[in-house]
C-alpha cells in the first residue's frame, strides 16, 4: 500500500457570518464624499401609558457611487467599521425624493 499523505495544513473551519442588522431610513445629508447621513426612526409604546414614542437617531452610511440624495428613502445594512463613525452601508435606494 502506498503511504498516503494528507494536506500540509488543515483548513480552518469557516465560521458563518453573524446576522447583520438592516434598517430603512431617510437621507438627511449627502454633503460628504461617499458618505450619507440617514435618520432612523424607532417607535415604541410607553410601558405604562401606552403612548407611541418616536425616537430618531442619525447614522453615517457608506455610499460608494454617491447615488443617494437628500430625502431619499434608503435601505442600509450593518458592516465592519469603515471609519471612526461609519458602520453602515447603502444597500439600495427604495424611493427617490420628489
UniProtKB/Swiss-Prot annotation:
Specify the cross-link site (Isoglutamyl lysine isopeptide (Lys-Gln) (interchain with Q-Cter in protein Pup)). 96
Molecular function (GO) terms for this protein are:
rRNA binding; structural constituent of ribosome
Q: Which SUPFAM superfamilies match?
A: Nucleic acid-binding proteins (SSF50249)
HAMAP family, alphabetized: Ribosomal_uS17_B
Quaternary data: Part of the 30S ribosomal subunit.
Family as reported in the entry's similarity comment: Belongs to the universal ribosomal protein uS17 family.
Q: What is this protein called?
A: Small ribosomal subunit protein uS17
Q: Which gene encodes it?
A: rpsQ
